[in-house]
Amino acid sequence: MSEKHPGPLVVEGKLTDAERMKHESNYLRGTIAEDLNDGLTGGFKGDNFLLIRFHGMYQQDDRDIRAERAEQKLEPRHAMLLRCRLPGGVITTKQWQAIDKFAGENTIYGSIRLTNRQTFQFHGILKKNVKPVHQMLHSVGLDALATANDMNRNVLCTSNPYESQLHAEAYEWAKKISEHLLPRTRAYAEIWLDQEKVATTDEEPILGQTYLPRKFKTTVVIPPQNDIDLHANDMNFVAIAENGKLVGFNLLVGGGLSIEHGNKKTYARTASEFGYLPLEHTLAVAEAVVTTQRDWGNRTDRKNAKTKYTLERVGVETFKAEVERRAGIKFEPIRPYEFTGRGDRIGWVKGIDDNWHLTLFIENGRILDYPARPLKTGLLEIAKIHKGDFRITANQNLIIAGVPESEKAKIEKIAKESGLMNAVTPQRENSMACVSFPTCPLAMAEAERFLPSFIDNIDNLMAKHGVSDEHIVMRVTGCPNGCGRAMLAEVGLVGKAPGRYNLHLGGNRIGTRIPRMYKENITEPEILASLDELIGRWAKEREAGEGFGDFTVRAGIIRPVLDPARDLWD
């Protein structure tokens, strides 16, 4: 992309305060243990407010009641979000029963939130329940280590229920990569699990004493599905199979979607192809990419610290050569692969192992007992009788995996009675939002609470123009950090202010093109008016099989983003 102007390998200058905090934290301990015993505040103070993120938690408050509490001279109602580490999204039914119980008894909101990074979150954990949640997870073989902040986050893996053998192999690699890149500090075990301090000094051979410059995201993807949205991630291993068996990976590095409104130095970027590697080099290459970013990433500006910016600064070829040097390998040429879609196949799918897999559409990933739709109770009942496992997808849905023919009817009956199999439109199945209000401190506009009624309106437009059986990949994210992955959608809404969004168009169905801003800071009626006209044109003028995003580019409605580091903001 930008080989012409390679910049310095290391950015000199004053380090950010986050770097000071990590350096002084004694390998992520800080004074979290002491802070836990401070009953005067419901939150964590000073550096601990940020340090708990390395332990998988974010401190939040209920923004719906923030002003009211301020008037009463009360501190915000602090509560933690906890995100579990769950490589590939696979969770046993025993683990599910434990998290269901904790959510119901020990969180403010009582829900389990499936995320588009293939794990679950608890929202609304009061300080007194913070230690118990880590102990509960540990008791069933789970943890929340390194699911937030400057680490390698939860490793994603394509949810492919059909090719069971290939999925099993890819999933094992997702787990191995996750384990290999975990921090080695004993802080987590000491603080949450009461394990004794050992005299040995901590060492972080891969992550280093100050960890990574910024968050780092990794995927294992099995074509032709791009359900995990590889271009949103720093490091991607694309599975290459021969005769149904995994033989190696294509490596793509440097994707990422987060931007800042109006800051043209920030941009979303698709990942760059580095080459093919045989399986035996996987962990060495993963480590080499991470340590190169550790050493070369910008620690003087967190808005310029992600791998995508490092690649653009030093040049893709320079970064790739350093990865080869550190891993002691030479990449082979990229092997052919293609993507055909990224949605989940809702309903029953029979695997080549003759087991059945039931993918349930969970709107916004929010599992709760709703009036007439007791989703949470239904899943608990299934977990009690199901012999296989559950798999969370990167589309915030849930797969009941490995159901023998003899158990199918029993599980389907519970699912139907609980509202887990209610029919929804293809459009709703292909729409997604991040959490946003009321819990996310960064939210600028509604997302999860906005999406259901917004999609009602879109469904009406699709029906009006005779395309109800079609879909447009549509996503809403409450702020430009982009958790809702709107910057890889055909239609992406990025929150700007309460009730206002930037409308992006021109991504594609398979998630390989960044959409461009079409209109700025507009309201829902204005968004719907624009889409009414454009969906009408698409319905009439499209070519056979042409998706909405591709149509908007071909028809000249929007210019495609070809080189986002240079042309995203044009």
UniProtKB/Swiss-Prot annotation:
Can you quote the record's cofactor note? Binds 1 siroheme per subunit.
What GO annotations for molecular function exist for this entry? 4 iron, 4 sulfur cluster binding; heme binding; metal ion binding; NADP binding; sulfite reductase (NADPH) activity
SUPFAM superfamilies given in the database record: Nitrite and sulphite reductase 4Fe-4S domain-like, Nitrite/Sulfite reductase N-terminal domain-like
Q: Does the keyword Iron-sulfur apply?
A: yes
Q: Name one Pfam family in it.
A: NIR_SIR_ferr
Q: Which domain of life does the UniProt lineage start with? A: Bacteria
Please list the reactions this protein catalyses. Answer: hydrogen sulfide + 3 NADP(+) + 3 H2O = sulfite + 3 NADPH + 4 H(+)
Where on this chain does [4Fe-4S] cluster bind? 434, 440, 479, 483
State the UniProt keywords alphabetically.
4Fe-4S, Amino-acid biosynthesis, Cysteine biosynthesis, Heme, Iron, Iron-sulfur, Metal-binding, NADP, Oxidoreductase
InterPro entries hit by this protein: CysI, NiRdtase/SiRdtase_haem-b_fer, Nit/Sulf_reduc_fer-like_dom_sf, NO2/SO3_Rdtase_4Fe4S_dom, NO2/SO3_Rdtase_4Fe4S_prot, NO2/SO3_Rdtase_4Fe4S_sf, NO2/SO3_Rdtase_FeS/sirohaem_BS
Cofactor(s) needed by this chain: siroheme; [4Fe-4S] cluster
Gene3D superfamilies associated with the record: Sulfite Reductase Hemoprotein, domain 1
Q: State how it assembles.
A: Alpha(8)-beta(8). The alpha component is a flavoprotein, the beta component is a hemoprotein.
Functional description taken from the UniProt entry: Component of the sulfite reductase complex that catalyzes the 6-electron reduction of sulfite to sulfide. This is one of several activities required for the biosynthesis of L-cysteine from sulfate.
Q: What is this protein called?
A: Sulfite reductase [NADPH] hemoprotein beta-component
Q: Which organism is it from?
A: Escherichia coli (strain K12)
Q: What's the source species' lineage?
A: Bacteria, Pseudomonadati, Pseudomonadota, Gammaproteobacteria, Enterobacterales
Quote the gene name from the UniProt entry: cysI
